[in-house]
Amino acid sequence: MRNFRKELWFTIPQRMEFVNITRDVDGCLKESGIREGLCLVNAMHITASVFINDDEGGLHQDYARWLEELAPHEPISRYLHNRTGEDNGDAHLKRQVMGREVVVAVTGGKLDFGPWEQIFYG
């Protein structure tokens, strides 16, 4: 079985943002030359996520609001994790909800998505 591994790095200027990385992943797939199989995309940072959904701004705002309602950033003291001196207890919980990775079928050298599906790093 052939495999290919490449790391992609993203700088996210805000505490929470959703970046469409579909083109980046597609570029890696093309570089790999793999025509059939599976493509695993995972976040290698403990408070980052990778997920598949629609690239629609209103939906992304809904996600941000919903996640903040589930695990508000403040008050920072509400999270036992933050006793370590960090302030990201909420981000760990949000990542758990959004997920660490996605797997996409590769068919004919292309990412095999359903309608509207895109890959996001958040």
Where are these regions (language model features)?
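Active-site histidine-anchored catalytic micro-motif
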Residues: M1-G122
